[in-house]
Amino acid sequence: MKSLLGLVIIALTFSTFVRAQGGHEYSPLVEKTVNYKNWSLVNLKTDKPEDLRSIMAGKKLVMVVYFAPWCGNWHNEAPIAAKLYEKYKDQGFQVIGVSEYGSRADVRTFFGEAGPPYPVVTESESRDDKQKTPHYGYRQLTGDTRNWGSPWNIFLEPAKTNQTGDVLTEKAWVVNGELIEDEVDKFISSHLASASAGVITPCKN
């Protein structure tokens, strides 16, 4: 019993240390049951609804990042998300931002005149919606105990998702906090390589 208690204390101490470094909330990449659903949300640039399946079409790996525009931890991750997107976009990697708990005007202000480098859609605009969004539900399923859960990242492999129905995938790799760049970079690289290796090129006459 004492040894078990000791392990629990060590785990909690390590978790606190990892999450508290320099105001960051880093979290490891883990596979979780999430029952992630398809959605249709309004695009920040076009002001028109976009369907997730449509955005994923033709991609090998998709990272959906949920964020609040006013959140300091999102401000920490945003450059990393943009960097990874620029590095791997030509290899079939897609980033999609889903804004939460802040107005679309605030989201536009955050990204500046150039706008976001990848598609951004809106799920909610009010802090009052904190416990009403699908984002909140996914966080509960994956054990995210943070107050706002920004950022929250989920990785989808389009080739392995359900092509019909509400639920895209039962399980997925998620990050309940800020990305650990080196870890996620390796994950993206290996998954893109695996996806490419699995592509069968038709014979040409």
Model segments located where?
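Sec-exported extracytoplasmic/periplasmic mature domains
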Residues: 57, 76, 83-90, 112-119, ...
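Conserved segment of the thioredoxin-like fold in thiol-based oxidoreductases
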Residues: 86-133
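Hydrophobic beta-strand anchors of alpha/beta hydrolase catalytic cores
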Residues: 63-64, 95, 153
